[in-house]
Amino acid sequence: MGMLVNVVVADLEDAGAIIESEKPVEEWKGFEANGLDPAKFAMLHALLSGELFDEALDECGPLHAASDEGPWLMNLPDDSVAHLAELEEDALDRVGEELAATEEFEEDGWSADEVKGFVTALADLAGVARAQGRALFVWM
């Protein structure tokens, strides 16, 4: 089951402030989404990088945690951010379709259109991060 997340663009040194924020999207450019979790981001990273899921999960693991109960902060790997930022619309649709067919999204009842929307929003934000030389963080 996924949770509410905030995906934001920020400088690496902002990580501590992001984890302490009650709602990062009010302080940094980004978007809020329901139903996401570390496994979904790891699966996306695995699809983009060609890594095995377990390796991708390790790379997407929490960067910071306010406590054992959360919130947690992940930094989406730079190579996935770069890949997302460079993909054209038809390629983003293909990634969304592949991601929608994974166990992580199917079990939570995500439609292909919902997954494509998530991937597109993430790619748009990845473009901002790359243009500004910043990182893409996931607060959950």
What is each of the regions a protein language model found here?
Residues 1-124, 128-131:
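Acidic (Asp/Glu-rich) sequence patches and key acidic residues
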Residues 133-135:
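Short secondary-structure junction motifs
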Residues 137-140:
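Short hydrophobic/aromatic patches at helix-to-coil boundaries
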